[in-house]
Design a protein with these regions (language model features):
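Short amphipathic alpha-helix used as the core "switch/output" element in two-component signaling
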Residues: 53-57, 78-91
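Active-site residues of response regulator receiver
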Residues: 69
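The feature encodes the CheY-like receiver
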Residues: 73, 82, 103
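Hydrophobic/aromatic residues positioned on beta-strands within the core alpha/beta folds
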Residues: 96-99
Length: 104
């Protein structure tokens, strides 16, 4: 199964173990879309807005879904979400917010 004609999913997760767990969950659910992993908030926005290392994707379609961690380096998940919602081109992309926390 794929979402929206095999469009890309953007996973924004800095913890490699959590990213691996999320990718495995997609795989076990037979979601076969290509998945791009961004390791921090700035990398996620660079991917979405075709900046920096991702400037070569300016003409490529946006992801069909964003899975976003809240606790990220460089720019937290809420900052990423605000930037996504502030732009006409990205404001309607569905965003699923996930986070894990170890409280003692």
């Amino acid at each position: 199964m794929t979402l929206a004609d095999n469009k890309t999913i953007l996973l924004v997760e800095d913890n490699p173990d959590d990213a691996k767990l999320t990718l495995r969950a997609f795989q076990r659910s037979n979601i076969l879309n290509p998945i791009v992993v961004a390791r921090d908030g700035i990398e996620a926005l660079d991917f979405l807005f075709a900046r920096g290392a991702h400037s070569d994707r300016a003409d490529m379609p946006l992801p069909t879904l964003i899975v976003l961690d809240l606790k990220l380096p460089k720019l937290d998940g809420m900052g990423v979400l605000r930037a996504i919602r502030a732009e006409e081109r990205t404001k309607l992309i569905p965003v699923v917010i996930l986070t894990s926390s170890k409280e003692e």
